[in-house]
Amino acid sequence: ESLQTRYAEGGDRAFDCEFMGRKLFFKALNFTSTPIEDSEEAAETSSLGRHLDGCRIGFDLGGSDRKAAAVIDGKVVFSEEIAWDPYFQSDPNYHFAGIRDSLQRAASHLPQVDAIGGSAAGVYVNNEVRAGSLFRGIPDDLFEDHVRRIFHRVMEAEGWADKPWDVVNDGDV
């Protein structure tokens, strides 16, 4: 039995087909066979973290708290944990306001913001939420307009969209 058949609608891996294909990458999974000599070279990966120069904000969004820190040239000048309960909140503004609040609180301890890095459980592609347990309470009809680009919206609201920033899975940090 071919992978294409197993990972198709109605196949025994239909859930994976829907999740990995349409939910994460907005298209159906497609499998092709290629001789090894014709395969593409591995892409370069980008390095995460270890950038200590300048005025930076780091944050981590968990299921019970939000953590944020402000750093100037590698020295922590502010660090805070704030309790929150995002899992079953159905209003995406709860998440937006909480994320924004943590970043603002950290930024208030810096003369300027040079870069931002964040993490949370889930799948993030190009700083967009594709799937995340923090957003499980958001109805599907609100997800696309209010959650998928939530980090872009926060950066734009704060005037930081032109700064270097990344949001990644917390296991990647």
Regions found by a protein language model. Give the residues of each.
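Glycine-rich phosphate-binding loop and adjoining helix at the ATP-binding site
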Residues: 2-30, 85-97, 115, 122-173
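Short amphipathic alpha-helical surface micro-motifs
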Residues: 39-40, 51, 99-100, 145-150
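Short, small-residue-rich loop/turn micro-motifs
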Residues: 72, 120-122
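Short glycine-rich, Thr/Ser-proximal phosphate-binding strand/loop in the N-terminal lobe
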Residues: 61-101, 105, 133-137
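Long, mid-chain structured domain cores
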Residues: 1-83
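Cysteine/selenocysteine-centered motifs that mediate thiol-based redox chemistry or coordinate metal-sulfur cofactors
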Residues: 106-113
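Short glycine-aspartate micro-motif
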Residues: 54-60, 113-117, 166
